[in-house]
Design a protein with these regions (language model features):
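Short acidic-glycine loop/turn motifs at beta-strand connectors
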Residues: 42-48
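Charge-lined substrate channels and their catalytic hotspots, especially those that engage the 3′ end
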Residues: 8
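Catalytic-core segments of class I nucleotidyltransferases/pyrophosphorylases
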Residues: 4, 13-17, 33-35, 48-133
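Short beta-strand segments
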Residues: 1, 27-29, 105
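A short, conserved acidic/glycine-rich loop-to-beta-strand motif
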Residues: 20-31
Length: 134
């Protein structure tokens, strides 16, 4: 994926370990300033994904898929059973597990850097973050 993420990975792992029953994937999420360019999600009160919208014209939220996941072994087994040379996680896996994907919100820093403008912005923002914490 073309994302830059700064987060507390121990907290992310802890969230996965303590996720609701019957969930097999924990997805990192973030607030995007450009929801039309991202896969955005809608979650229930437990933080479980109920809807996923990939780069739609009228996104229903600004909470986006960070494309960073922790998965159970059962998810890997499912992917192997697909018998594909290339598995597209957004197309082949996420829809199958809809309603069984827990979310972890990264409030520290996450930016899609898939174009020059966002890449340059990430350089400025992360330089600012590091100066602020030094």
């Amino acid at each position: 994926a073309d994302n830059l993420s700064i987060c507390d990975y121990k907290d992310f792992i802890s969230a996965h370990k303590n996720r609701p029953a019957n969930t097999e994937i924990t997805m990192m999420t973030f607030t995007t300033d450009d929801p039309k360019s991202c896969g955005v999600i809608k979650i229930d009160n437990s933080g479980i994904i109920q809807e996923f919208h990939e780069k739609v014209q009228n996104p229903p939220s600004t909470i986006a898929n960070g494309a960073v996941y922790i998965v159970e072994a059962s998810v890997i087994s499912y992917m192997e059973r697909l018998k594909k040379v290339k598995v597209d996680f957004s197309v082949d896996v996420l829809p199958y597990y809809m309603g069984r994907i827990f979310t972890y919100y990264n409030g520290l820093y996450h930016r899609d850097i898939g174009n020059i403008r966002s890449y340059e912005l990430a350089q400025i923002e992360t330089n600012f973050l590091y100066r602020k914490t030094s």
